[in-house]
Design a protein with these regions (language model features):
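Extended, low-polarity segments enriched in aliphatic/aromatic residues
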Residues: 1-189
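Short, cysteine/histidine-rich loop/knuckle motifs that typically chelate Zn2+
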Residues: 192
Length: 193
């Protein structure tokens, strides 16, 4: 899927600022500046992407395309209070007391994942961005400011080791696809041209 409908108001602004929470995510490992833009996709399209993109890396490629489409001017990740474990729905609060900001959302996400104690470049969105040659490597990012040497050890989601697997049982997938996939309706006047 290379098309998505975005909220209309994006075109009303000269510059976009992405403000995300620092948290773990059972499907994507972590979620930060890039995944935050998923909120700009209209309505049921979000569910459609989740149902059709069952592999972490496939969904991550959509997030890379979405980020490149919106291109925020500034990306801020709020880690003053963050989330670890089974985020974003059932995680636990962590007082990380950190804010990450960058003009490059991928760089912000790499630094965030690294600070959380994750293999930053193995996270699906980072891996997709690296594969598409759209992002820099962690070692090439210069970090400045207070807390630049701060390191945390966030509890990882239970899915962390299986980031290449699908995340929903097949019967739920089938049910969801049936409900959210449009089907053509043939008009009785159709002459099969």
């Amino acid at each position: 899927i290379k098309q998505f409908e975005l909220v209309d108001c994006l075109s009303d602004f000269d510059k976009i600022i992405s403000v995300a929470k620092m948290k773990t995510h059972v499907f994507m490992g972590v979620t930060g500046a890039v995944k935050n833009l998923f909120g700009c996709i209209v309505g049921t399209d979000k569910a459609r992407f989740h149902l059709r993109m069952q592999k972490h890396i496939d969904f991550a490629h959509v997030m890379v395309d979405l980020y490149q489409t919106i291109k925020p001017t500034l990306n801020i990740i709020d880690g003053i209070t963050a989330m670890e474990g089974q985020g974003p729905m059932s995680g636990d609060v962590v007082d990380a007391k950190i804010i990450i900001a960058s003009s490059d959302g991928f760089a912000a996400d790499l630094i965030m994942a690294d600070k959380m104690g994750f293999d930053a470049e193995a996270m699906p969105i980072a891996a997709a961005g690296i594969e598409e040659k759209r992002i820099v490597h962690l070692k090439d990012i210069k970090v400045v400011g207070d807390g630049k040497d701060e390191q945390f050890h966030f509890v990882k989601p239970h899915t962390y080791k299986s980031m290449q697997d699908t995340y929903l049982p097949k019967f739920i997938l089938k049910l969801g696809q049936n409900q959210l996939t449009s089907k053509p309706v043939i008009n009785k006047n159709c002459v099969a041209c």
